């Protein structure tokens, strides 16, 4: 596994830049909410728990974990977040950083980049009585899934494993925001922009 500061490709730096941009948008991320990840081989770098995406470039807040070890741990349907931490080859930083509780969710989504935001426009619509019907109108031509609310973390990971299809790269989480997946940062940016345009048209 890649350790510490050894992984500093241009792509990784652009990932940090995009994470910071997301963190600056208060309609997408509030305080320490939201998380992003990038995969390189079996290593996934993910935002550490309790840290702010707005600080993605100014401080060390990404933690490397083994994707295969997380997936192996999830085979035990009774596993907990702490048990996953014990089972993975985690490099604990001098500051004691721990990966986001959403790390399992990121690991089971087979895309290079995962961006999870607490988008207020998505959440405002998701709590409405007929929201799923509305989302079907808005995103009819996208590869997306609506995920009924479950507790963030392990429970959400299992729900995604149950409902997702191979091609799904957009997930609407009831009362919990949005997940956008892609193989490039440009794809991530385009999806976010496209989703925003669709939501604005719907509300207007």
Predicted regions: what is each one?
Residues 1-204:
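Glycine-rich flexible loops
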């Amino acid at each position: 596994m890649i350790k510490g500061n050894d992984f500093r490709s241009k792509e990784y730096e652009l990932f940090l830049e995009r994470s910071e941009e997301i963190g600056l948008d208060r309609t997408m991320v509030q305080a320490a909410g939201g998380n992003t990840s990038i995969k390189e081989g079996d290593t996934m770098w993910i935002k550490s728990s309790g840290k702010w995406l707005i600080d993605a470039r100014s401080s060390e807040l990404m933690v490397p974990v083994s994707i295969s070890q997380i997936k192996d741990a999830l085979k035990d349907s009774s596993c907990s977040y702490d048990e996953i931490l014990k089972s993975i080859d985690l490099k604990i930083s001098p500051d004691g950083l721990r990966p986001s509780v959403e790390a399992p969710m990121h690991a089971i989504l087979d895309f290079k980049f995962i961006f999870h935001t607490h988008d207020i426009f998505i959440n405002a619509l998701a709590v409405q009585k007929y929201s799923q019907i509305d989302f079907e109108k808005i995103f009819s031509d996208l590869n997306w899934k609506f995920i009924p609310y479950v507790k963030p973390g392990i429970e959400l990971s299992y729900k995604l494993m149950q409902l997702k299809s191979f091609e799904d790269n957009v997930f609407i989480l009831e009362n919990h925001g949005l997940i956008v997946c892609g193989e490039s940062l440009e794809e991530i940016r385009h999806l976010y922009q496209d989703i925003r345009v669709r939501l604005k048209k719907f509300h207007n």
